[in-house]
């Protein structure tokens, strides 16, 4: 597992232009929205919520949508024949992404402060929220990956779904302003709880923490069950590659 983490770091730092793109791209993507929100005294809130959302996006690309890349590259079959379970492989990649995203987030916050004069409130608590919420986001992406394994057409709507998840989680508009039906859907996404915690300055009640833990656990259980089921079906069909 630790070899997999080391491999990802070595791969990224071997290709320096790719590394620079990964490190600095989030700032240029987030900056226009932060500048616009700053006109309404909401720059700090939008900055924090979009960084939280970017963590979900990276986890989806690395853990869920990344399955498509593994199939195209012919690597998925090798992973399934290795001693490590596929969920273990996903967990190893999740650990790598935590360190990667912490570094990217730090660079993004420094750049937004230098060039935009905007930063998040209570930086220490914000980083703590990022790390804790990433556990729920990992559970969510494991569940999401079961759909990627089952339905090939997920590849075509992946980017759209990422934006839907971000919107429902309240990365632009607080969830409490949504209609009841949308609010119900929002609370099925672990990211919602992280953004809400930031909105209320991290004064989260135990009930809210329990809801976050329960939703995350449900996604993990559903993901593990259906990932194993779909992988067994792929093994029977020999469908490990995609051309």
Can you say where each PLM-predicted feature lies in the sequence?
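Hydrophobic transmembrane alpha-helices and immediately adjacent juxtamembrane helices
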Residues: 1-131, 135-243
């Amino acid at each position: 597992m630790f070899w997999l983490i080391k491999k990802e770091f070595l791969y990224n730092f071997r290709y320096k232009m790719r590394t620079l793109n990964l490190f600095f791209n989030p700032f240029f993507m987030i900056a226009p929205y932060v500048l616009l929100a700053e006109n309404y005294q909401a720059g700090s809130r939008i900055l924090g919520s979009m960084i939280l959302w970017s963590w979900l996006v990276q986890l989806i690309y690395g853990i869920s949508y990344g399955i498509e890349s593994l199939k195209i590259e012919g690597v998925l079959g090798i992973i399934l024949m290795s001693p490590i379970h596929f969920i273990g492989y996903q967990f190893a990649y999740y650990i790598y992404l935590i360190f990667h995203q912490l570094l990217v987030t730090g660079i993004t916050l420094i750049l937004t402060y230098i060039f935009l004069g905007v930063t998040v409130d209570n930086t220490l608590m914000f980083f703590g929220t990022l790390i804790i919420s990433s556990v729920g986001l990992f559970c969510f992406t494991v569940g999401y990956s079961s759909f990627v394994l089952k339905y090939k057409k997920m590849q075509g709507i992946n980017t759209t779904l990422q934006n839907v998840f971000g919107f429902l989680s309240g990365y632009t508009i607080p969830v409490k302003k949504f209609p009841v039906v949308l609010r119900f859907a929002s609370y099925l996404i672990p990211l919602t709880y992280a953004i809400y915690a930031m909105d209320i300055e991290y004064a989260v009640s135990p009930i809210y923490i329990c809801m976050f833990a329960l939703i995350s656990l449900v996604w993990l259980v559903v993901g593990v069950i259906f990932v194993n089921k779909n992988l067994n079906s792929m093994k029977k069909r020999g469908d490990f590659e995609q051309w």
